[in-house]
Amino acid sequence: MSYFPWLTILVVLPIFAGSLIFFLPHKGNKIVRWYTIAICLLEFLIMTYAFCYHFQLEDPLIQLKEDSKWIDVFDFHWRLGIDGLSLGSILLTGFITTLATLAAWPVTRNSQLFYFLMLAMYSGQIGLFSSRDLLLFFIMWELELIPVYLLLSMWGGKRRLYSATKFILYTAGGSIFFLIGVLGMGLYGSNEPGLDLERLINQSYPTTLEILLYFGFLIAYAVKLPIIPLHTWLPDTHGEAHYSTCMLLAGILLKMGAYGLIRVNMELLPHAHYLFSPWLVIIGAVQIIYAASTSLGQRNFKKRIAYSSVSHMGFIIIGIGSITNIGLNGAILQILSHGFIGATLFFLAGTACDRMRLVYLEELGGISIPMPKIFTMFSSFSMASLALPGMSGFVAELVVFFGLITSPKFMLMPKMLITFVMAIGMILTPIYLLSMLRQMFYGYKLFHVPNKNFVDSGPRELFLLICIFLPVIGIGIYPDFVLSLSVDRVEVLLSNYYTK
């Protein structure tokens, strides 16, 4: 057992070191870039060391615990700890954020502020995944809003202010319900508010109150995940944001909603989750079909990829709603798989858009001839997104399928119907992705247009793409490497769930 404050260092280091960026000399962007990369690499190395040598995979309980009193007035503690549910998300955050800072090298306007905001997001995300106090969880949840809003509103397309405003309105609206739920759980049945997750797990509520709390939290998570019909901010945001910001949004921010749904709704409110789970499965199945169909009608290829993210989130919702070991592990695997694939697709879309200055599919064609490397990687990650066997997307969706089929919660006919709907969604996915590839890369429309910007990927971009492609293939070939992180904790969570 380690008493060293590893998690506090991981939470504080990025934002503290990031604040020193403003004191660096204003001689170009090179110093700021390398400094930010160094901070991200140092954070990731500390993270990897701490988890390799101080985290026991076979122990399903909370590890690396830290508990310090922060505010005496209402018993607010700085409580941190991790388990198998949060370990994968923290490693994903470190990996994607490090590569997103590398992707952001072309940013030259206000680069110091840009990199500081990325590091501030980094701290908030690590803090959220390692929080063991519900109020601290809420604070870290809200810490994301300001950096993301500024990243969206200051760097992006022509309608970036509109998309940033839409994002802040949606997420702030959901946060109101989150705060009401936090206060309701903290004040119920006690004269002194207590928000320790360990205590709240053993807290029981009247059925009506538990349903109201569950619904309030669900609205907040439905915005971030997103769940239809609270998803409309996502295509606008991804259509306008800089591609390094899109990597953080698709790779990590959406996963915060899924993590909250498991950590709070499923773990703390089991009775309500049991009642809501059929509706979650139905919503997830509808979301897969709806988002895939809508994606097919998008002219903007960035928005087409954004709707594909909404569709893939449907598998996570179904896995969480299945209430089985297999289904929940599949949902966690899909969280990690889509974190890699979604972030890379937006990076590729952004780099292609920077070169072509075009985003509408009918204006494109023949890009594979001047840019064969971008074409190869775009095709490879599109195959991963449509769940090609041997890649992480296939394993994650297959495990969710098995989780739903083996669920004792549902009868045979509903399971067959939901499985049929999911299968239709999986058929629609290659249709909209392959049609996008055909319109962008095949033909001769842009091949004869002289353009000095039509250059292929450089070493920096290829290094980034290969770094993400390796875990996508690795998880597809040997998924037990990732499943071993969460399987014991999921078993404990569901055993407690059924006993309640």
From Swiss-Prot:
Q: What biological process terms from GO does the record include?
A: ATP synthesis coupled electron transport; electron transport coupled proton transport
Secreted as UniProt keyword: no
Q: Name one Pfam family in it.
A: Proton_antipo_M
Q: Which reaction does it catalyse?
A: a plastoquinone + NADH + (n+1) H(+)(in) = a plastoquinol + NAD(+) + n H(+)(out); a plastoquinone + NADPH + (n+1) H(+)(in) = a plastoquinol + NADP(+) + n H(+)(out)
Q: Which residues cross the membrane?
A: 4-24, 35-55, 87-107, 111-131, 134-154, 167-187, 211-231, 242-262, 272-292, 313-333, 334-354, 386-406, 417-437, 462-482
Q: Which keywords appear in this protein's UniProt record, sorted alphabetically?
A: Chloroplast, Membrane, NAD, NADP, Plastid, Plastoquinone, Quinone, Thylakoid, Translocase, Transmembrane, Transmembrane helix
Gene Ontology terms for molecular function = NADH dehydrogenase (ubiquinone) activity; ubiquinone binding
- Cellular component, GO annotation: chloroplast thylakoid membrane
Q: What EC number(s) is this enzyme filed under?
A: 7.1.1.-
Give a yes or no for keyword NAD in this entry: yes
Tell me the compartments it is located in: Plastid, Chloroplast thylakoid membrane
How is this protein situated with respect to the membrane?
A: Multi-pass membrane protein
Q: Sorted alphabetically, which InterPro entries does this protein's record hold?
A: NADH_Q_OxRdtase_chain4 (IPR022997), NADH_Q_OxRdtase_chainM/4 (IPR010227), NADH_UbQ_OxRdtase (IPR003918), ND/Mrp_TM (IPR001750)
The record's NCBIfam families line, in alphabetical order, gives: NDH_I_M (TIGR01972)
Task: Describe the family membership recorded for this protein in Swiss-Prot or TrEMBL.
Answer: Belongs to the complex I subunit 4 family.
> Know the name of this protein?
NAD(P)H-quinone oxidoreductase chain 4, chloroplastic
